């Protein structure tokens, strides 16, 4: 009996075994997941869907071609008479495959001819809102499909560039109404179109007025403050937020300046270099949309805008189901 007690005491007194951290056994190779992800992404390619909205003649097609350095978006034809302006807003899209350094991207540009071109532009945002929601619905139905595809084609609008005419005054009621409504369902990036028509002083004043209008009307454009993930994100995004709206100039014409090939526009005052940040803010817009935030734009579309639509639609379906059950129970009670 004493031996049993002694053995039990020894067992209790035995020190707990300490596991060595995995790092002590040498290299594991967890970081290799990054290379695996890179190879998979390069093999599959990815999609980016960008919508451009603004009245005719603001250089929407030219800016898109300049952003991606490709003849992607067809130049819209300037109507010569009132009859040639579409009676309703048309939604047109064109898809272009781009490859750079082994990375493949399927770019879809959605244009909205007819927006803001009429005397009465009341509710002209509705067809655009419907189109955006239709893409969410299409994606949702694919997700709910029992035999859904391994990779669902993504036609959701990731970003909407909204073109503001360079009036030098303030936002029009049309601008405010459109951005106020659409910013709830899509990432809005406002730009001042053809900013070279303004002096630097006029441009700065116009940007200040627009910023004040956005704030006064509760319009939350991309990158939204509430989606900053950490202090590093906040620091980077704050710099972009201070530039919004981007004052841009687009051009797909190349010129030689002091032995350098540049994209630019020639005026009677000289050549405007599109990618020169002292001339315009095109380079900052390109950085935001392509070089630093493209994946984040897609993530916000999926986790915020599409998720809000998905929850709304599923709640609607649940309510319809509940109402249907209640109706059947009421009918059965009446029959009794």
Where are these regions (language model features)?
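Eukaryote-biased feature marking scaffold/signaling PDZ-domain proteins and nuclear chromatin regulators
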Residues: 23-25, 41-48, 53, 58-59, ...
